Regions:
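Class I SAM-dependent transferase core
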Residues: 1-75, 91, 105-122
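A short acidic, Gly/Pro-enriched loop at the edge of an enzyme's catalytic core
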Residues: 72, 130-138
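Conserved beta-strand/loop positions that form the S-adenosyl-L-methionine
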Residues: 77-79
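Conserved SAM-binding loop of SAM-dependent methyltransferases across substrates and taxa
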Residues: 81-94
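Helix-to-beta-strand junctions that scaffold the AdoMet/dcAdoMet cofactor pocket
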Residues: 92, 158-160
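Short beta-strand element of Class I
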Residues: 94-100
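Active-site capping/gating segments
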Residues: 98, 171-212
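Conserved SAM/SAH-binding loop
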Residues: 125-131, 144-145
Length: 212
């Protein structure tokens, strides 16, 4: 199999990570190359990120598959370069994935990436998350906004029985504490901090809130 020409081979996933990704690995390799070319050209990721596309971006997003099931509907808000939305669409081919992104330049990139990857399970909406009528079982985000704002945008889009999955970093607990005014309004839906990515030899911090 030929690997993406623009991603340094030294940064490719390990054999065990490749196996964990399953059949989606081939398309993820294509997506990595799209990010390394058009993503950099359009300023969606920095040139220095090319060597870290897999571990910092694609694998980081792929860890969310541990918290989702194939076939569940997904909304990715502030989708940007398709992280995690495009990654989840590849790894969960039976899930309808809606990417919400307000910037034209980014939606143009997402539209082209969708076409290049042949993703029939992706819908792209140009606009802000606030006021959208679409809903889903899972609402994801990554590096979009502080948790209090993020929950205000995400919660109306989550179907009953669904959940918010927000990829966060080392300050997840601090953000959760700062968002208490918002989380206190969610009644019987406590927020928890989850670590996922074990199958990918990663540790990814996710704030998870289920809508009961």
């Amino acid at each position: 199999m030929s690997l993406g020409p623009n991603v340094p081979r030294g940064t490719m996933p390990t054999k065990s990570q490749e196996q964990a990704l399953g059949p989606g690995f081939v398309q993820l390799t294509k997506f990595a190359d799209i990010l390394a070319q058009d993503g950099v050209r359009l300023g969606l990721i920095g040139p220095r990120e090319v060597e870290r596309i897999w571990d910092r971006h694609i694998l980081n997003c792929a860890a969310l598959t541990e918290l989702t099931e194939d076939g569940q509907s997904i909304i990715d808000i502030g989708s940007g370069a398709g992280l995690p939305g495009i990654v989840l669409a590849i790894l969960k081919p039976n899930s309808k994935v809606t990417l919400i992104e307000p910037m034209q330049r980014r939606t143009d990139f997402l539209t082209q990436a969708k076409a290049d990857l042949g993703l029939t399970n992706v819908e792209i909406i140009r606009g802000r998350a606030e006021g959208q009528k679409v809903t889903a079982q899972i609402v994801t985000s990554r590096a979009v906004a502080p948790l209090d704002k993020l929950l205000a945008w995400s919660w109306p889009l989550v179907q009953k029985g669904g959940k918010v999955l927000a990829i966060k970093g080392e300050k997840a607990q601090e953000e959760l504490e700062n968002a208490q005014k918002v989380t206190s309004l969610l009644k019987d839906s406590p927020a928890t901090i989850t670590t996922c990515g074990l199958a990918l030899d990663l540790s990814v911090t996710v704030v998870q809130i289920s809508k009961r």
